């Protein structure tokens, strides 16, 4: 089974995925920023590690991913803060790809969004621009990396029951 490092471990997607991964026999190391979230992740079956993605270097990411065979990126700042979107959705994601290439990790799963492409047509004046541009850049780096990758590009995320409908691009 895989040894997965899951960035953004306390986010909604990660909290739904973690028990499924653990039940399937995978080991999940869950990277979180807030130490108050450790107990909740232990309860889900993850091995939590507290780290601030905005402060990690490529070497810092390398230390975290060492011993894992898969990176799952579910971290994201969203559109609330432009500086955090650039720092997490672009810089930290790209650093994790670079660390994977230096280390032994060859599989990468990115949770992105359905409009993630360089020609996304989001106006630079739109509050969503930094997030959309950061995601587009990170996804492009992943595609060009040579890693065995999957980019999951959902539209709207909801708490509705799973429909089972997934389209492959």
Which residue ranges define each predicted feature?
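Structural motif
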Residues: 3, 69-70, 107
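N-terminal Rossmann NAD(P)H-binding glycine-rich loop of SDR-like oxidoreductase domains
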Residues: 3-26
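Conserved beta-strand positions in the Rossmann-like core of class I SAM-dependent methyltransferases
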Residues: 5, 29, 49, 150
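Cofactor-binding loop segments of dinucleotide-utilizing enzymes, especially the Rossmann-like FAD-
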Residues: 9, 33, 113
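Conserved dinucleotide-binding and phosphotransfer motif residues
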Residues: 24, 44, 145
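NAD(P)H-binding glycine-rich loop region in Rossmannoid oxidoreductase-like domains
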Residues: 30-95, 99-102
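Glycine-/Pro-rich loop/turn segments that contact NAD(P) or position catalytic residues
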Residues: 77-169
């Amino acid at each position: 089974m895989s040894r997965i490092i899951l960035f953004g471990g306390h986010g909604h997607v990660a909290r739904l995925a973690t028990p499924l991964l653990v039940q399937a026999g995978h080991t999940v190391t869950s990277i979180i920023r807030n130490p108050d979230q450790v107990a909740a992740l232990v309860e889900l079956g993850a091995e939590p590690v507290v780290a601030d993605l905005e402060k990690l270097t490529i070497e810092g990411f390398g230390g975290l991913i060492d011993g894992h065979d898969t990176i799952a990126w579910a971290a994201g700042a969203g559109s609330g803060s432009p500086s955090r979107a650039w720092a997490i959705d672009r810089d930290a994601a790209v650093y994790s790809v670079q660390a994977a290439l230096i280390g032994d990790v060859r599989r990468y799963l990115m949770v992105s969004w359905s409009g993630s492409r360089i020609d996304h047509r989001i106006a630079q004046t739109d509050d969503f621009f930094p997030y959309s541009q950061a995601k587009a850049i990170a996804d492009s780096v992943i595609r060009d990396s040579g890693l065995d990758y999957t980019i999951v590009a959902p539209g709207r995320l909801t708490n509705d029951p799973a429909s089972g409908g997934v389209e492959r691009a």
